[in-house]
């Protein structure tokens, strides 16, 4: 599927974009390149290929869950404009 400059111009209008002639030609070429890549993907033969959840057939070794930062609540609350009972107070946005 190939897009014409007229179609790209309509897409740009719907996206509230203003394109000059050079930008229109460039974007038309770029979008046609992208759609041709999707066409290539659609034509790949995948019969007999099992879906996989992860490309690697091994489990990821995870590090031990250890606290790596020191407690800084008092420091952060000391520079906050308003704090009450350990909570930051902010202006009401929705009533």
Curated annotation (Swiss-Prot):
Its EC number(s): 6.3.5.-
Domain of life of the source: Bacteria
Record-level Gene Ontology MF annotations: asparaginyl-tRNA synthase (glutamine-hydrolyzing) activity; ATP binding; glutaminyl-tRNA synthase (glutamine-hydrolyzing) activity
UniProt entry keywords in alphabetical sequence: ATP-binding, Ligase, Nucleotide-binding, Protein biosynthesis
Keyword Ligase on entry: yes
InterPro entries (UniProt xref): Asp/Glu-ADT_sf_sub_c, GatC
Enzyme class, broadest EC rank: ligase
Gene Ontology biological process terms from the UniProt entry: glutaminyl-tRNAGln biosynthesis via transamidation; regulation of translational fidelity; translation
Pfam families from the UniProt entry: GatC
Catalytic activity: L-glutamyl-tRNA(Gln) + L-glutamine + ATP + H2O = L-glutaminyl-tRNA(Gln) + L-glutamate + ADP + phosphate + H(+); L-aspartyl-tRNA(Asn) + L-glutamine + ATP + H2O = L-asparaginyl-tRNA(Asn) + L-glutamate + ADP + phosphate + 2 H(+)
Listed HAMAP family: GatC
Subunit details: Heterotrimer of A, B and C subunits.
NCBIfam families: gatC
Family: Belongs to the GatC family.
Role: Allows the formation of correctly charged Asn-tRNA(Asn) or Gln-tRNA(Gln) through the transamidation of misacylated Asp-tRNA(Asn) or Glu-tRNA(Gln) in organisms which lack either or both of asparaginyl-tRNA or glutaminyl-tRNA synthetases. The reaction takes place in the presence of glutamine and ATP through an activated phospho-Asp-tRNA(Asn) or phospho-Glu-tRNA(Gln).
Protein name per Swiss-Prot or TrEMBL: Aspartyl/glutamyl-tRNA(Asn/Gln) amidotransferase subunit C
Source species: Vesicomyosocius okutanii subsp. Calyptogena okutanii (strain HA)
Gene name linked to the record: gatC
């Amino acid at each position: 599927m190939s897009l014409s400059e007229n179609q790209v111009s309509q897409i740009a209008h719907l996206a509230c974009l203003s394109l000059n002639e050079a930008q229109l030609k460039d974007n038309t070429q770029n979008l046609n390149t992208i759609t041709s890549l999707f066409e290539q993907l659609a034509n790949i033969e995948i019969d007999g290929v099992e879906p996989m959840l992860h490309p690697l057939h091994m489990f990821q070794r995870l590090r031990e869950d250890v606290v790596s930062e020191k407690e800084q609540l008092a420091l952060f609350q000391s520079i906050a404009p308003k704090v009450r009972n350990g909570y930051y107070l902010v202006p009401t946005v929705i009533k």
